[in-house]
Design a protein with these regions (language model features):
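Acidic, surface-exposed loops and disordered segments
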Residues: 1-193
Length: 193
């Protein structure tokens, strides 16, 4: 089992940060994040998520018009904002990712199945992204408040990728955090049958 310190880093002491320290993250850290999360499970090893790392001011300015007002400051101030999206043609890689069967045939021409599979598994991969980021010492701020159509048009004009959510990553400013909000107790959220 992981140590209590590691569990604190990933879960119990981790927070979603909206304010950031003026400290850059490195491309090596970004590489570490992906090289951890890629090993986490997806159905049929389909791996449909795609990650666009926005670090430069020019790229952030391309993102800004798509952001809801409440997310502008926390996104623009983050050392890096990541677009978690899915590849609408993820099945093209299945001959490599899932070589034990003709998995591609299960998706070709089946738009709803492609969309449902891609959204579900990319959301999982987005959660793995958060845990991987925390494991390399970074803080996160996942956000939904943005215009997906506008963002997709700006960053993915060919329509192949579709955004799910964005996430600021960096070193959070703990002095700006509110007191942690409560969570549901086991009996309120779970049952054993």
């Amino acid at each position: 089992m992981l140590s209590n310190k590691n569990l604190d880093t990933l879960f119990t002491k981790a927070r979603s940060h909206k304010a950031w320290l003026n400290k850059d993250i490195t491309n090596h850290q970004i590489d570490q994040i992906y090289n951890l999360l890629k090993f986490a499970p997806t159905s049929g090893n389909c791996c449909p998520a795609r990650f666009t790392f926005i670090k430069t001011n020019d790229s952030k300015n391309r993102l800004k018009p798509a952001l809801d007002k409440g997310n502008i400051e926390q996104a623009m101030d983050a050392p890096c904002v990541v677009i978690i999206s899915y590849d609408t043609e993820f099945y093209e890689s299945l001959s490599i990712l899932s070589p034990h069967s003709d998995a591609k045939a299960n998706f070709v021409g089946k738009e709803n199945k492609v969309k449902n599979t891609a959204e579900f598994n990319s959301t999982l991969q987005g959660a793995y992204f958060i845990m991987a980021s925390r494991s390399v010492g970074l803080d996160c701020c996942p956000m939904l408040g943005f215009n997906k159509e506008m963002l997709n048009k700006e960053f993915f004009p060919d329509g192949k990728y579709k955004s799910l959510f964005i996430c600021g990553i960096g070193y959070g400013d703990s002095s700006k955090l509110y007191e942690r909000a409560p969570r549901l107790d086991f009996i309120e959220a779970c049952c054993i049958v």
